[in-house]
């Protein structure tokens, strides 16, 4: 079944609410035979949609699946590019790994890889990312920006802004950014962002943005070593959160910010990022591969590099683990 027809069929059911829609009306709306309509509905049932069929009345949608699915993500997605080419799998080793393979095979910009569970999810510096089934968002987005190599770190900050805005739009939850790639709620990590690049000499071939979000986890779902430092959107709101809705809003915000970035450069993103960032103007400790530095965070420069005012002068921090206070 073509994904566009599946999306259109779900939209028809949603518009009808609790009312039945005749097979002929669906057939006319989708431009296919009534036999094809039946086949399309059977495909939806396989995805977990509960569809009631009554002779001489037609069909109506009783219940959507509780699990994440390609159809749920596609339905209501208002982007033009981001996520329109979508690969969804229930279980995957790593969305980032699959996205790299797709990028190598000329997948178009905006291609999104989403999984309900990762068996080998990873974060920055090859750290393990705990990504269990049924509770989180694990996705990777392929970009093909025409920018110099040295500007690719800016896309991590752009992604962070889009995630903050998308979460607030989808769930009404305000979050903070901790440089460079963590999103926090009340000081606890909720989102991690991993940016990787494929390049040839001085040319960017693709940028892969990996985003992991703790959505519906409760305290007992986290390993003991994470319970005190991690949280989820559901824990913050006290409610179960629609994962597909969060994905849709993040993609829409990302598309808008990415368009701004490609048209107007990094300055609009920089201003937004600093408005959401924790620790600007306060002291922090930056642990880098070349040593640990302590000082006052002045903000980020025009390349997205953290500026730390230390006793020895202003230090540029390109990559580090940050400890606030």
Curated annotation (Swiss-Prot):
Residues of the BPL/LPL catalytic domain: 74-262
DNA-binding region: 23-42
GO cellular component: a single term: cytoplasm
Gene name, Swiss-Prot/TrEMBL: birA
Signal peptide coordinates: none
SUPFAM superfamilies: C-terminal domain of transcriptional repressors, Class II aaRS and biotin synthetases, Winged helix' DNA-binding domain
Record-linked InterPro entries: aa-tRNA-synth_II/BPL/LPL, Bifunct_BirA, Biotin_CoA_COase_ligase, Biotin_operon_repress_HTH, BPL_C, BPL_LPL_catalytic, HTH_11, Transcriptional_repressor_C
One Pfam family recorded for the sequence: BPL_LplA_LipB
Enzyme class, broadest EC rank: ligase
GO molecular function: ATP binding; biotin--[biotin carboxyl-carrier protein] ligase activity; DNA binding; transferase activity
Native organism taxonomy: Bacteria, Bacillati, Bacillota, Bacilli, Bacillales
Catalysed reactions listed for this entry: biotin + L-lysyl-[protein] + ATP = N(6)-biotinyl-L-lysyl-[protein] + AMP + diphosphate + H(+)
Protein name: Bifunctional ligase/repressor BirA
Free-text function comment from the UniProt entry: Acts both as a biotin--[acetyl-CoA-carboxylase] ligase and a repressor.
Organism of this sequence: Bacillus spizizenii (strain ATCC 23059 / NRRL B-14472 / W23) (Bacillus subtilis subsp. spizizenii)
